[in-house]
Amino acid sequence: GEAFDRIKDNPLVGEYNLILQENVFVDYDGHQGIAKAKGVDSTFEAGSTLAGHITNGEFSLHKGQLPQMVVGAGLAYKMGMNPAFLASAELYFPIRDRNFSLANPAASIETVRMRPSGIFSVNQQIDNDLIILPIEQMRKLLGYEEEVSGVELRLVEGSTAKDLRSAIKDIQKELGPGFKVLDRFRQ
C-alpha cells in the first residue's frame, strides 16, 4: 500500500526486502526435521551480505530457472546436506484450505523440491534451523499468491544508532499500531 511505498522512499532506507517465513517439515536423503524457511525476494538475493558467510558452495537462489536454497550450517550438518551432492530436499507444509485426510495424507500437504546451493554460518541460533529460498517457492508451498509475513529493511551505509531509532519511530508512525517495527536485536 501507500504506507509501504513511503517507507521505501525514506532517505534512511537503503534496502527494502519482502519476506515470507514459516516453519516447515524438511526431508533430505532420509533425514527429516523441522526448519524455519524464509522466502526472500530478488532484492534480498542481489544485496545480501550472506554471500560473505558461505562456508560451502555458493549463495545462489536460482540456477537458470531452477530454484535453489541456502541452508544454515547447523541444520545442514544435522540433515547431512552438502551442495556437492545431487540430492534435493523436499519441504512440506499442510495445505491451508483443506482438512487433513487420514485416508490420503499426501493430498493434504503441499511440497516443493530443490537442491541446496550453499551452506552459511552466521551464528548458532540462525545456523541451526534456517533455510533461505526464493519467495515464489515459499508462496507455492504455503498456498499464497502475493502475501508476505514481513518486510526487512537495511539502512543506508553509515547510519548511526540515532538514525536507527529515528527510522524505527518514523516507520512505526507511518504504519500505525497494527504493525510491529523491530530492529534485528528485538526480533
Regions found by a protein language model. Name each.
Residues 20, 38-40, 56-135:
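Hydrophobic secondary-structure segments that place a key small or acidic residue at a functional site
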Residues 93-99, 103-187:
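Mechanotransmission and gating elements of multispan inner-membrane complexes involved in transport
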Residues 1-36, 42, 53-65:
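Hydrophobic, regular-secondary-structure patches
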